[in-house]
């Protein structure tokens, strides 16, 4: 009986001490995808603090840039070069809005939700952007929980 209790206690301690593993999410920048022309796919990513988002220019002439009005407080803006992959490690809970600089007017936007109940949801809903971008962003915001 003592050995079973000791083994159970050791297993519980190891489970508590094991570090969490960050997930890696891949987002493709495409000329054409499931939701139309000039898209991030997937356009909505659910992540946890510490996760990594890899933005991959699957098709040429794309980049990823933060939408400054849709970033958690304290997170610095970012912008990749055209035709280059970009890795973003999300550290703060909240919404991270992204756009492709040359195709923003065509609606090329995406959204990353980190954690639950983002504090910057209202800012994301009211951020000014071109009509097509606003329509797509609203569709992504509908997935926030």
From Swiss-Prot:
Subunit structure: Homodimer.
Native source organism of the sequence: Paracoccus pantotrophus
Signal sequence, renumbered to the chain: 1-22
Alphabetical list of SUPFAM superfamilies matching this protein: Cupredoxins (SSF49503)
Domain of life: Bacteria
A single GO cellular-component term on record: periplasmic space
Any one Gene Ontology molecular-function term assigned to this protein's record: electron transfer activity
Protein name, per record: Pseudoazurin
Alphabetically ordered keywords of this record: Copper, Electron transport, Metal-binding, Periplasm, Signal, Transport
Region (Disordered): 126-145
Record note on cofactor: Binds 1 copper ion per subunit.
Compartments, as annotated in UniProt: Periplasm
Functional note: This soluble electron transfer copper protein is required for the inactivation of copper-containing nitrite reductase in the presence of oxygen.
């Amino acid at each position: 009986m003592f050995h079973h209790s000791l083994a159970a206690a050791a297993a519980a301690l190891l489970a508590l001490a094991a570090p969490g593993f960050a997930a890696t999410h891949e987002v493709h920048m495409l000329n054409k995808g499931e939701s139309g022309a000039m898209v991030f796919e997937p356009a909505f990513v659910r992540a946890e603090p510490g996760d990594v988002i890899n933005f991959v220019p699957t098709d040429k002439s794309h980049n990823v840039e933060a939408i400054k009005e849709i970033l958690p407080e304290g997170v610095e803006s970012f912008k990749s070069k055209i035709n280059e992959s970009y890795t973003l490690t999300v550290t703060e809970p909240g919404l991270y809005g992204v756009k492709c600089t040359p195709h923003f007017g065509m609606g090329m936007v995406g959204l990353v939700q980190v954690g639950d109940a983002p504090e910057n949801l209202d800012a994301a809903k009211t951020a000014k952007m071109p009509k097509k971008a606003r329509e797509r962003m609203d569709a992504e915001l509908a997935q926030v929980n």
